[in-house]
């Protein structure tokens, strides 16, 4: 009988050890001539590994990005998804720990005129589940996959948010530059109209020439108003990203913007492995395989 019990325990442990869930490893074999020649790995950091503060050095833009990371509703929702997945993962890890049960008891007994006797007991029992077929292990792997996927989603939302704020900011700088040029052009045409009218009064130009100059002047005025409207629309878009009321945002000048003078884009395969959507797809496949083995 004792021998049979030992044999049964040994079989159970062997089944639990081998498991039916194999670790997924993505294929990384790349043909040598895929990129038309030998790829040399450089020590310089790729663009995808740079911190956004190193790429965007404008203090006004950095301030806007920091505000967006604190107030944007999509990013906050992604943060909550990460916290939820982390709690699920912790629950899956705790399933491997033994469960303790505490059942305190007390009795009072008395015989005839003798003093009552009080008896107390504090039994503690421990139990745990043998993961014979890998169910608990697969659940833990699923929780890990969901946590990694939620983290990749958060990173993707964060990247899109930073890129959106930066793109909107530089659009404002570009429109500011165009507006400044248009206003200078407006002043130049205003002087041209005045000069042409003076020439007409002196008999050196006709009414047709004045009308042509005025038409060009009014056209430039219209472009100034159009640029001002575009700036208001872009500021509204920026306010939407920052989850705040639209306002006139303080900003720098396009001509003074500085970017890294030299950076590497990185090896294509490494760039793909750094993309949150690619990592999320790989994790989704891992989650699916874990679900199918249950």
Q: Predicted segment positions?
A:
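Acidic, proline/serine/threonine- and glycine-rich low-complexity intrinsically disordered segments
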Residues: 282-283
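Terminal intrinsically disordered/low-complexity segments used for targeting and assembly
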Residues: 2-8, 15-70, 228-273, 279
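Periplasmic alpha-helical coiled-coil/stalk elements that build and connect Gram-negative outer-membrane
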Residues: 145, 152-268
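Residues that define the transmembrane beta-barrel architecture of outer-membrane proteins
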Residues: 116-120
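Single conserved hydrophobic/aromatic residue that forms the stacking wall/gate
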Residues: 287-294
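A glycine-/polar-enriched beta->alpha junction
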Residues: 67-76, 83-98, 111-112, 125-142, ...
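A short, acidic/glycine-rich surface segment
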Residues: 109-113, 249
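Transmembrane beta-barrel strands of outer-membrane/channel proteins
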Residues: 102-108
């Amino acid at each position: 009988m004792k021998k049979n019990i030992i044999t049964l325990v040994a079989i159970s442990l062997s089944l639990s050890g081998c498991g039916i869930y194999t670790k997924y490893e993505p294929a990384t074999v790349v043909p040598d001539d895929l990129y038309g020649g030998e790829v040399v790995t450089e020590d310089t950091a790729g663009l995808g590994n740079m911190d956004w503060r190193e790429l965007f050095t404008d203090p006004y833009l950095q301030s806007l990005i920091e505000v967006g990371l604190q107030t944007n509703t999509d990013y906050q929702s992604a943060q909550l998804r990460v916290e939820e997945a982390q709690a699920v993962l912790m629950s899956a890890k705790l399933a491997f720990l033994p469960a303790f049960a505490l059942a305190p008891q007390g009795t009072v007994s008395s015989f005839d005129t003798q003093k009552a006797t009080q008896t107390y007991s504090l039994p503690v029992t421990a139990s745990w589940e043998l993961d014979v077929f890998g169910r608990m292990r697969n659940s833990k792997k699923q929780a890990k996959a969901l946590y990694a996927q939620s983290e990749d989603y958060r990173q993707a939302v964060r990247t899109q948010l930073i890129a959106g704020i930066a793109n909107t900011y530089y659009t404002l700088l570009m429109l500011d530059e165009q507006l400044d040029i248009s206003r200078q052009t407006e002043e130049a045409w205003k002087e041209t109209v005045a000069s042409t009218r003076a020439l007409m009064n002196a008999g050196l130009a006709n009414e047709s020439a004045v009308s042509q100059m005025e038409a060009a002047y009014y056209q430039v005025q219209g472009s100034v108003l159009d640029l001002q409207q575009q700036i208001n629309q872009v500021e509204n878009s920026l306010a939407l990203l920052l989850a705040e009321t639209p306002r006139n945002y303080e900003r720098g000048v396009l001509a003074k913007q500085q970017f890294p003078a030299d950076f590497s884009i990185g090896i294509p395969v490494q760039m793909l492995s750094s993309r949150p959507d690619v990592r999320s797809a790989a994790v989704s496949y891992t989650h699916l395989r874990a679900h199918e083995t249950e």
